[in-house]
Amino acid sequence: MARAFPLERVRNIGIAAHIDAGKTTTTERILFYSGVVHKIGEVHDGAAVTDWMAQERERGITITAAAISTSWQEHRINIIDTPGHVDFTIEVERSMRVLDGVIAVFCAVGGVQPQSETVWRQADRYSVPRMVFVNKMDRTGADFLKVYDQIKDRLKANAAPIQLPIGAEGDLSGIIDLVSNKAHIYKNDLGTDIEETEIPSDMAEKAAEWRSKLMETVAETDEELIESFLENGELTIDQLKKGIREGVLKHGLVPMLCGSAFKNKGVQLVLDAVIDYLPAPIDVPPIQGVLPSGKDDVRPSEDNAPFSALAFKVMADPYGKLTFVRMYSGVLEKGSYVLNSTKDAKERISRLVVLKADDREEVDQLRAGDLGAVLGLKNTTTGDTLCSTDDPIVLETLFVPEPVISVAVEPKTKGDMEKLSKALVSLAEEDPTFRVSTDQETNQTVIAGMGELHLEILVDRMLREFKVEANIGAPQVSYRETIRSSSKGEGKYARQTGGKGQYGHVVIEMEPGEPGSGFEFINKIVGGVVPKEYIGPASNGMKETCESGVLAGYPLIDVKVTMVDGSFHDVDSSEMAFKIAGSMAFKDGVKKCNPVLLEPMMKVEVEVPEDFLGSIIGDLSSRRGQVEGQSIDDGISKVQSKVPLAEMFGYATQLRSMTQGRGIFSMEFSKYEEVPRNVAEAIISKNQGNS
């Protein structure tokens, strides 16, 4: 079967931003103007095509990354609409991993918000080229150039406006295209009748000034363009387009567009810019991976290369389990067998589909550069690599943030226990930041996630999709433990029962690991003092012991262990004996290494009228918060701070009462930090009292 669109005419893009910037409305308009939908769906009416979960339509927020295919100017555009709420940051993370370009949507009034910075960092982590759409130019207080300044200052991006709005707020009537040096005037409310004209005389001077700035910025990205610019005093339209595109692909330039998706202005120009400036799969570096030999390798974005794909999302679906994949190389055929190289398991491809939100089109094959979904996979989860059985490779996986909040959950009736277990397994398969465990002391089922809204929506889904009514306990903070110094640890396990004994002996050196490294094990046993077959069990014993630290039973992180010595017995030694000895050595070492308790710190930004600033700062300080910055703009104070999650429960209610309902705040995970001694002692004694 021939390819419907050549690779250079494919764009895999994401639409990302902070909550309420208008991402989903922008996506809806893209689908309307490109002919996928024939009437406009509004988020606030609960009719958006990409918001297809019941809770999304009710709450007017996007929870999951919906993938949709459309076409524009003879190009295939695969779009992922991502959530802006911080509790669903994994959805943004996994979509960034598989995208080639991003449209970052900003509100013309709110500008750069804390969640905008998070999304920007995620795009940086995966080196995703991007452009900016400043939306909501029809709103009171809209200011395109203020957002431009914020993007340069707060995101440190080389932003370059390639458009200017004609009018603003209620008077937004059109858009100046600085590249073509023309104005686009909107003649009807649907945004389908657009007249291209000369730039209005009252804006000619401003447009000339910004066009000159654009030429200068673009010329700086390329030596040939600099020469041409210095020689001729300007760049041609073709040179401008080529320079902007190259600047975007090299991450040296971020073009800025403007409009109002809700008022149907500017969206077709966004689509034109996606094609002109964002990369095709062949414009980005080939995906990197590791061969079975341990050697690094790459897979070029070509149909005739060996097949490789990354599973970036798993979803329970009325038709069975849907696994979303990004095709990196080769061709995937319906009915074929492939290798899950992450788990070393064979999988059969039952059916292949391309999605238009909750509508799907069955296809016989997916090709390099495509985004699609597979039915029939049994063992594949988020972040796994699928590849050809003849040419195995493991692709770079996803970064998954640790959950920061947990609650106990139990079914309302005993008969629902099995249904609850199935629901939790299914939800955990879909969402890597949702963890399920059993509390060893109380035997309760504990679920953990990225925030209160995250867990609330998952509990809601249990009821809607799995018909399980559950009781939820009070939220608990996910503390961690780590070590601050180095020491040796020793574990000797020797038992004599009847004829056969048990013997294992392990000596380790322990030291703090790099932040984010988790548990790191190095084997330095020489001369066979401990046989190879016992090293793995000893390491496993230590890794399992990490799950429950010595202070208060919280997981131990960022620990580096080197096994340096030990002994064994020809007859009595066994894998189990060395697993126990490894665990004993680990516990012995941790106690000598100055163990400390860590807590999740949250980045909290509060916006309040100026009059309330003093009481807000006082309240944050009483919550062990550290104020890191503040600013005042038009009588509204913004306070940036870092506050322990443990002190933030119920903050929304408190803020409402302190500001008479006029304050808003956003919160996202920052990092784990050491708990002050007096607070740590209270947590430890409470946990030891419960055990």
UniProtKB/Swiss-Prot annotation:
Residues 8-282 form the tr-type G domain. GO terms for cellular component: cytoplasm. GO terms for molecular function: GTP binding; GTPase activity; translation elongation factor activity. The keyword GTP-binding applies. It is found in: Cytoplasm. Its main location: cytoplasm. It holds the Pfam family GTP_EFTU_D2. One of its GO terms (biological process) is ribosome disassembly. Belongs to the TRAFAC class translation factor GTPase superfamily. Classic translation factor GTPase family. EF-G/EF-2 subfamily. PANTHER family: RIBOSOME-RELEASING FACTOR 2, MITOCHONDRIAL, TRANSLATION ELONGATION FACTOR G-RELATED. Catalyzes the GTP-dependent ribosomal translocation step during translation elongation. During this step, the ribosome changes from the pre-translocational (PRE) to the post-translocational (POST) state as the newly formed A-site-bound peptidyl-tRNA and P-site-bound deacylated tRNA move to the P and E sites, respectively. Catalyzes the coordinated movement of the two tRNA molecules, the mRNA and conformational changes in the ribosome. This is Elongation factor G. It comes from Prochlorococcus marinus (strain SARG / CCMP1375 / SS120).
